[in-house]
Amino acid sequence: MALKERIGTVVSDKMDKTVVVAVINRYPHPTYKKIVSKTTRYKAHDPENSCVLGDRVKIKETRPLSAHKRWAIEEILNKTIMSKEDKK
């Protein structure tokens, strides 16, 4: 089975070595054909604590690392510059 990859935005970095990544999936509604957006939040392993809020990242599927972590940060695509006032 191939490993899955997703691209999303970091929405929480308050845990140690873990970030929450929101991935938006767009698909047409089966009956009405309107494009529907569904947001899925994944907990991903960030061993160096290098991700901050707002970063655009690529995550990949991995073995279970904890009760809820099944994903790991593969690379940071766009880095966000956060000031100290924004962090609070």
Curated annotation (Swiss-Prot):
Keywords: Ribonucleoprotein, Ribosomal protein, RNA-binding, rRNA-binding. Signal peptide: none annotated. InterPro entries: NA-bd_OB-fold, Ribosomal_uS17, Ribosomal_uS17_bact/chlr, Ribosomal_uS17_CS. GO terms for molecular function: rRNA binding; structural constituent of ribosome. It comes from the Bacteria. GO terms for cellular component: cytosolic small ribosomal subunit. Pfam families: Ribosomal_S17. The keyword ATP-binding does not apply. One of its GO terms (biological process) is translation. The keyword rRNA-binding applies. CDD domains: Ribosomal_uS17 (cd00364). PANTHER family: 40S RIBOSOMAL PROTEIN S11 FAMILY MEMBER, SMALL RIBOSOMAL SUBUNIT PROTEIN US17M. One of the primary rRNA binding proteins, it binds specifically to the 5'-end of 16S ribosomal RNA. Belongs to the universal ribosomal protein uS17 family. Part of the 30S ribosomal subunit. This is Small ribosomal subunit protein uS17.
